[in-house]
Amino acid sequence: MTPAPKSSFVLAHRHLLGIEGLSAADITGLLDLSEEYVELNRQIDKKRTSLRGRTQVNLFFEASTRTQSSFEIAGKRLGADVMNMSVSSSSMRKGETLIDTAVTLNAMHPDLLVVRHHASGAVELLARKVDGSVVNAGDGAHEHPTQALLDALTIRRNKGRLEGLTIAICGDVMHSRVARSNILLLNIMGARVRVVAPSTLLPPGIERMGVEVARDMREGLNGADIVMMLRLQRERMNGSFVPSSQEYFQYFGLDQKKLGYAKPDALVMHPGPMNRGVEIDSIVADGAQSLIREQVEMGVAVRMAVLEALARNLPNA
């Protein structure tokens, strides 16, 4: 059995529904606890007992591989009893409402619920109807807080800080919950955030979120410490936002030439899944400047930290 982490950080919130509402101290506390789990996860014995006797329900109304698997591994390594539910196996497929599902689940007294839903705000609605702690694993185009936290951890481990860095977030900003959560977190932590996309993929009024806006890669990547690529979220598009995948890659896909517009020591990130040859070239994705695989590793550590920090607030914790 691995030793307990030294950090005694407790998240001063019952749920983690988004980055919005978190303080710099909250974020730093979660990242510091995550750092300890990175090291613990690299040991042969990865099991902890901090969630022993707790029940964690992963309720995913959208298909997910990496996020659901990451939360499942995180819960099991902490000793929780983990149950996975998908929309295909839920009563909602038979017409049950989200509220009825929440009330039914609450009657089973789960301690932690990890929820992903296609509708923005659905996770917050569900959280109002349950007694346990809820983690937002992505709601529509609204937020994906644990992705932003794992991205922040990855950046901090490689650059030593977040404050003062220039982060270029490139691609389908319009439909991206990852972009929104990252913008919120990076602004809180004092980074300079720039979004890079064609006008059709920029939400109206994005400047009000405290970002710089660029509509071509040369301008957008100039001086960037981190280049964060986003995929085209065609499942959230009602019409044609780009002429074609080939033309999009020509102007906004990240290849070696465009990466050269950033700082020489710039690092590349992508939340996944990647569309190779659309928003990113394979040579860049698999190259020496890529942090994409490391992001996946950081995801488990961050989700362990989030689950533990919330569980420390639960009754009899």
From Swiss-Prot:
Q: Which domain of life is it from?
A: Bacteria
Q: Pathway listed for it? A: Pyrimidine metabolism; UMP biosynthesis via de novo pathway; (S)-dihydroorotate from bicarbonate: step 2/3
Q: Name one GO molecular function term.
A: aspartate carbamoyltransferase activity
Which Gene Ontology terms describe the biological processes this protein takes part in?
A: 'de novo' pyrimidine nucleobase biosynthetic process; 'de novo' UMP biosynthetic process; amino acid metabolic process
- Catalytic activity entry: carbamoyl phosphate + L-aspartate = N-carbamoyl-L-aspartate + phosphate + H(+)
| Quaternary data | Heterododecamer (2C3:3R2) of six catalytic PyrB chains organized as two trimers (C3), and six regulatory PyrI chains organized as three dimers (R2).
Question: What Gene Ontology terms describe where this protein resides (cellular component)?
Answer: cytosol
Naturally occurring in which organism (per UniProt): Rhodopseudomonas palustris (strain BisB18)
- What EC number is given for this enzyme? 2.1.3.2
What function does this protein fulfil? Catalyzes the condensation of carbamoyl phosphate and aspartate to form carbamoyl aspartate and inorganic phosphate, the committed step in the de novo pyrimidine nucleotide biosynthesis pathway.
Entry keyword set = Pyrimidine biosynthesis, Transferase
The protein's name in its UniProt record: Aspartate carbamoyltransferase catalytic subunit
| A Pfam short name | OTCace
> In which family does this protein belong, per the annotation?
Belongs to the aspartate/ornithine carbamoyltransferase superfamily. ATCase family.
Is Magnesium included in the keywords of this UniProt record?
Answer: no
Q: Where does carbamoyl phosphate bind?
A: 66-67, 116, 144, 147, 272-273
* Segments traversing the membrane: none
List of residues binding L-aspartate: 94, 177, 231
Which InterPro entries does the annotation name? Asp/Orn_carbamoyltranf_P-bd (IPR006132), Asp/Orn_carbamoylTrfase (IPR006130), Asp/Orn_carbamoylTrfase_sf (IPR036901), Asp_carbamoyltransf (IPR002082), Asp_carbamoyltransf_Asp/Orn-bd (IPR006131)
